[in-house]
């Protein structure tokens, strides 16, 4: 079954991003148009829409565009195996755990500050 081809505006609407975001993703090699019209307009297939949604979800989960690029490259590469993807995911999880410890320490410090000011004295 052949994918439906979409203009950049339609893909932006379907994926919930701006056309500028799509152009940026293309510049960063996260996506690429499936083809171009005779006039040079970008045309994207349904896979591009899925890919953009994956990128946005991964960003929402805290992955950087660099992390996402690495995951997408692993997915595209025939030689990539589950172990490669697993290694990237483990490294990301470790970074998140480190950030979480820092945030917990900051939260504890803020709690101490709040408690020290509970009497209303300035």
Swiss-Prot record:
PROSITE patterns, per database record: HTH_MERR_1, HTH_MERR_2
GO aspect biological process, one term: response to mercury ion
CDD domains registered for this protein in UniProt: HTH_HMRTR
Keyword match Nucleotide-binding: no
MF terms in GO: DNA binding; DNA-binding transcription factor activity; metal ion binding
Cited Pfam families: MerR_1
Gene3D superfamilies noted in UniProt: 1.10.1660.10
PANTHER family: HTH-TYPE TRANSCRIPTIONAL REGULATOR ZNTR (PTHR30204:SF92), REDOX-CYCLING DRUG-SENSING TRANSCRIPTIONAL ACTIVATOR SOXR (PTHR30204)
Protein name: Mercuric resistance operon regulatory protein
